[in-house]
């Protein structure tokens, strides 16, 4: 890596080092594991870097799924900080890395539709992307079928690859070809973003 590249990443490196310092220690995780109930666990987390994510509301205290959803918001906010402080030529790659959570959400939504779950049951199993543009997941669930949900992905990066996958979905009566198409789409777009980096950065990234 050249001196100019090192300088370009200095700011984001400092931010990441600070985030590493906020990670829970093994000892803290062991203490949290010993908590007798969710309310006690949340109270203990109030002493950690997750405090801002877990206001002691009824929703988080009563539901471990909701508590986990709120905790995951911290990762979204940390990603945002990293992206904002990264060199401009690397930001779209970092955004694409973050979109792996969108991929997981998309597959979870399609699985939920397949088994007939409603939006209220699905929504807090998803990764919270907060301010980042994402797919119309609530509308997809409300559409009622996998086919109609995929139709709502018109004019998105997924459309071209999901059309042939939908044919296989009907033929095989399985979501597997759809999920494979989603994964391949993601990794191809990630590879394309790597190709936009400076040559030396491409070598390191690969």
Language-model-detected regions and their locations in the chain:
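N-terminal domain-start signal
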Residues: 1-206
């Amino acid at each position: 890596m050249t001196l100019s590249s090192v300088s370009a990443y200095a700011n984001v490196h400092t931010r990441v080092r600070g985030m590493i310092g906020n990670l829970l220690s093994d000892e803290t995780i062991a203490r949290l594991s010993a908590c007798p109930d969710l309310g006690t666990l949340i109270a203990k987390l109030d002493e950690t870097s997750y405090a801002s994510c877990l206001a002691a509301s009824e929703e988080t205290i009563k539901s471990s799924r909701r508590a986990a959803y709120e905790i995951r918001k911290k990762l979204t906010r940390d990603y945002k900080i990293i992206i904002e402080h990264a060199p401009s030529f690397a930001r779209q790659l970092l955004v694409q890395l973050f979109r792996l959570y969108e991929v997981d959400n998309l597959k979870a939504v399609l699985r939920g539709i397949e088994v007939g779950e409603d939006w209220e049951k699905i929504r807090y199993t998803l990764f919270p992307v907060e301010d980042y543009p994402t797919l119309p997941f609530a509308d997809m669930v409300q559409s009622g079928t996998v086919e109609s949900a995929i139709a709502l992905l018109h004019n998105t990066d997924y459309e071209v690859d999901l059309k042939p996958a939908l044919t296989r979905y009907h033929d095989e009566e399985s979501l597997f070809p759809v999920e494979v198409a989603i994964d391949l789409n993601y990794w191809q777009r990630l590879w394309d973003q790597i190709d936009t980096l400076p040559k030396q950065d491409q070598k390191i990234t690969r």
